[in-house]
Amino acid sequence: MQIFVNGEKLQTEATFLNLLLVELGYEGNWLATAVNAEVVPLEARDQFILHEGDKVEILSPMQGG
């Protein structure tokens, strides 16, 4: 299916958000995720079903100063 990840088109076979993160090489519990502008908490990622055309945002913390 085709989805968008951080604004870029992506073809994926992942059906759940947690599987997409694995496919893209994201590891750890420090990520923030949203699908179609709705935050998806860590504990819900393995149950969150992706659909054609979804807009996924994956955010990682940044150090600032």
Regions found by a protein language model. Give the residues of each.
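Ubiquitin-like/PB1-type beta-grasp interaction modules and other compact soluble beta-rich domains
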Residues: 1-64
